[in-house]
């Protein structure tokens, strides 16, 4: 089944140089002056110039139907920059733009369209640089050093708005109702869309649209907006503006997965790995006060301490949630890593996963059936695989051209150093023993006898995440593993990409002339003691998969150089991100959930206690998006994931799934 096929826009440029959609036979913007029309209709129609200086919240959220060339977004971004320059002390500090696009432009077509507006070039170039692959769902772009966030939702807007998480309800400050004309694209202009706009709009939110069609005005009025006609731009006689004056009360469709945030802006993060580091940055960007407590004497001493780690998405032959989450997480990770103003060893050399036997070949064939964009993953035959990786393989597979390897240890330490410059407080050699709720705060107790009090707490301490009374029932487990460090040779140095088989082998790091090969797997084992048997197994798995490859025999583990770590994993291979669930209250409240779904209350959680964990062996891929998701949730901001996929990350999911079926939770 072609699950992940997003059709790019097919367009041509008319005599005026304006892009025209072949699918809808309509222009993307006015032939006369598209830039001025955007300023008049959407910025003026929503009165943004007068609203920005008096906005009482640090974040202003705009939603749009039909991203197209991005003209509306770029024009708004330019205006927001001017506002920030003129009003540096204003309460409003950040802009969040949410847009939906069924047929996204290619990067090349986007760049051609942007040539129309040279004055927007400083902003257009940033957008082009981060333009995402045509994958369905939400693509979060962090622009202007995080001051501007763009959520691009690729897919049908009427389907996507039904899939949005409930935390987005009543958050939008202004709507840009754009898109091809109703007569050209009637499928978009529906009561379903108008009702979704009303559901997402906060009381007092505004909307503007270029059309004055009667059915649009009536539909928006029926949805709850107060509508008025205004003079249109240029030769257009009329346009529509509206205000949400009602206070709607949307219902929760799945309250057992509801994500609650915090009105507070102070937290303690427990941990010292890549998840803790990236979460610190994401919260600091939102104005939080953050204190990091780490049991070790420096960061990246746990699972994030390896010399080389592979970056590529996990794909599944049968799990839709994995296939929705990891490709998006991977592309977000690449954008974030590329934008970080820190240095760390890495090479985006590509990753190739080989089908060395019948079972692995079947698995890869099923992964390829997902019809992912070639920029993310594509098939290789044996000859193509050998050309890509640079060594003899005798088999084909699947390649991830944007993947590669990085040094997690360097990355983690560099990010924490960057966060410290931005206000992060760090406390090393602090081993947490217990958490005690005290009124509206959490008291932290450490092995030293020291205590600390914080308004909120995030547990991001790897395989030790279930060491506390509140988290002990979580269905997570430890996985011990050993990665071997091997010296390069002339034959091994030919390896150009990360090679994945029944293990993995990285290209050499030019700074130390070593490769990493691994990793052993010991479920339930928390030992970090070096094992000679694991060294042998790491080498033998390579030889077993490529028995005819002479280069593989040059892998030398006799130097006994290795690193042992412990990962935290779940049975369904997905992370756990969000509120820490109250296990006993969940079982009590949802004892009859299978028979009484309609009257169920929101999920029982520990107020102000959150978690980010169970990243397994793909933490480099999933940690950036997980950190962004949790920071958004904690801050009551839009979450860059659809409700179904977000539910698949909820720490209570394995219990709730059983309760929904009337099964016992053990």
Swiss-Prot record:
Pfam families recorded: DAO, Methyltransf_30
E.C. code: 2.1.1.61, 1.5.-.-
Cofactor: FAD
Record has RNA-binding as a keyword: no
KW Nucleus (keyword) present: no
Keywords, sorted A to Z: Cytoplasm, FAD, Flavoprotein, Methyltransferase, Multifunctional enzyme, Oxidoreductase, S-adenosyl-L-methionine, Transferase, tRNA processing
GO molecular function: flavin adenine dinucleotide binding; oxidoreductase activity, acting on the CH-NH group of donors; tRNA (5-methylaminomethyl-2-thiouridylate)(34)-methyltransferase activity
Location(s), subcellular: Cytoplasm
Chain residue ranges for the region called tRNA (mnm(5)s(2)U34)-methyltransferase: 1-245
Region of interest: FAD-dependent cmnm(5)s(2)U34 oxidoreductase: 270-666
Catalytic function, reaction form: 5-aminomethyl-2-thiouridine(34) in tRNA + S-adenosyl-L-methionine = 5-methylaminomethyl-2-thiouridine(34) in tRNA + S-adenosyl-L-homocysteine + H(+)
Alphabetized PANTHER family for the sequence: SARCOSINE DEHYDROGENASE-RELATED, TRNA 5-METHYLAMINOMETHYL-2-THIOURIDINE BIOSYNTHESIS BIFUNCTIONAL PROTEIN MNMC
Family classification: In the N-terminal section; belongs to the methyltransferase superfamily. tRNA (mnm(5)s(2)U34)-methyltransferase family. In the C-terminal section; belongs to the DAO family.
Protein name: tRNA 5-methylaminomethyl-2-thiouridine biosynthesis bifunctional protein MnmC
Native organism: Salmonella typhi
Chain's gene name: mnmC
């Amino acid at each position: 089944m072609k699950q992940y096929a997003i059709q790019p826009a097919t367009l041509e440029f008319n005599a005026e140089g304006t892009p025209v959609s072949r699918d809808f036979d309509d222009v993307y913007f006015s032939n006369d002056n598209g830039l001025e029309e955007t300023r008049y209709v959407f910025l003026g129609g929503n009165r943004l110039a007068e609203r920005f200086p008096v906005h009482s919240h640090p974040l202003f959220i705009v939603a749009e139907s039909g991203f197209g060339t991005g003209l509306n977004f770029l024009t708004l971004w330019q205006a927001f920059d001017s506002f920030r320059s003129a009003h540096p002390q204003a309460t409003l500090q950040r802009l969040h733009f949410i847009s939906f696009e069924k047929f996204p432009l290619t990067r090349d077509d986007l760049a051609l369209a942007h040539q129309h507006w040279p004055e927007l070039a400083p902003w257009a170039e940033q957008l082009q640089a981060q333009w995402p692959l045509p994958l369905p769902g939400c693509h979060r772009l962090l622009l202007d050093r995080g001051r501007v966030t763009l959520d691009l939702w690729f897919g049908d807007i009427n389907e996507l708005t039904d899939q949005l998480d409930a935390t987005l309800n009543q958050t939008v400050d202004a709507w840009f109702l754009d898109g091809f004309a109703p007569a050209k694209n009637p499928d978009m202009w529906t009561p379903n869309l108008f009702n979704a706009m009303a559901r997402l709009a906060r009381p007092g939110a505004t909307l503007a649209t270029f059309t004055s069609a009667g059915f649009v005005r009536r539909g928006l009025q029926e949805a709850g907006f107060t509508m008025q006609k205004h003079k249109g731009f240029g030769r257009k006689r009329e346009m529509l503006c509206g205000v949400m004056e009602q206070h709607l009360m949307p219902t929760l469709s799945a309250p057992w997965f509801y994500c609650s945030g915090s009105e507070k802006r102070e937290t303690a993060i427990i941990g010292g790995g890549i998840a803790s580091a990236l979460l610190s940055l994401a919260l600091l960007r939102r104005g939080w006060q953050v204190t990091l407590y780490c049991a070790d004497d420096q960061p990246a001493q746990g699972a994030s301490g390896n010399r080389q780690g592979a970056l590529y998405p996990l794909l599944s032959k049968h799990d839709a949630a994995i296939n929705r989450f990891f490709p998006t997480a991977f592309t977000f990770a690449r954008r974030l890593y590329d934008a970080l103003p820190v240095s760390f060893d890495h090479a985006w050399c590509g990753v190739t996963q080989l089908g060395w036997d019948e079972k692995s070949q079947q698995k890869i064939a099923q992964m390829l059936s997902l019809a992912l964009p070639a920029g993310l993953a594509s098939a290789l035959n044996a000859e193509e695989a050998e050309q890509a990786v640079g060594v003899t393989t005798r088999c084909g597979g699947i390649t991830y051209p944007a993947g590669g390897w990085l040094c997690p240890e360097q990355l983690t330490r560099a990010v924490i150093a960057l966060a410290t410059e931005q206000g992060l407080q760090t406390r090393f050699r602090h081993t947490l023993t217990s958490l005690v709720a005290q009124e509206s705060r959490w008291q932290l107790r450490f092995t030293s006898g020291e205590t600390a009090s914080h308004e909120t707490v995030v547990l991001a301490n790897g395989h030790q995440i279930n060491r506390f009374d509140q988290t002990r029932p979580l269905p997570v487990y430890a996985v011990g593993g050993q990665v071997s460090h091997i010296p390069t040779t002339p034959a091994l140095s030919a390896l150009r990409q990360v090679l994945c088989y029944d293990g993995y082998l990285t290209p050499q790091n030019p700074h130390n002339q070593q490769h990493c090969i691994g990793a052993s797997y010991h479920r339930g084992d928390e030992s970090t003691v070096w094992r000679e048997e694991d060294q042998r197994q790491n080498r033998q798995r390579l030889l077993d998969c490529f028995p005819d490859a002479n280069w593989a025999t040059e892998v030398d583990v006799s130097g006994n150089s290795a690193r042992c770590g412990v990962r935290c994993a779940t049975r369904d291979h997905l992370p756990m991100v969000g509120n820490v669930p109250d296990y006993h209250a969940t079982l009590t409240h949802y004892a009859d959930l299978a028979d009484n779904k309609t009257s169920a209350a929101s999920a029982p959680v520990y107020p102000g206690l959150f978690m980010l964990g169970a990243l397994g062996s793909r933490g480099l891929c999933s940690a950036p998006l997980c950190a962004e998701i949790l920071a958004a949730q904690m801050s009551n901001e839009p979450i860059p994931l659809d409700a179904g996929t977000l539910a698949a990350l909820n720490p209570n999911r394995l219990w709730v799934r059983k309760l929904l079926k009337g099964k016992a939770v053990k």
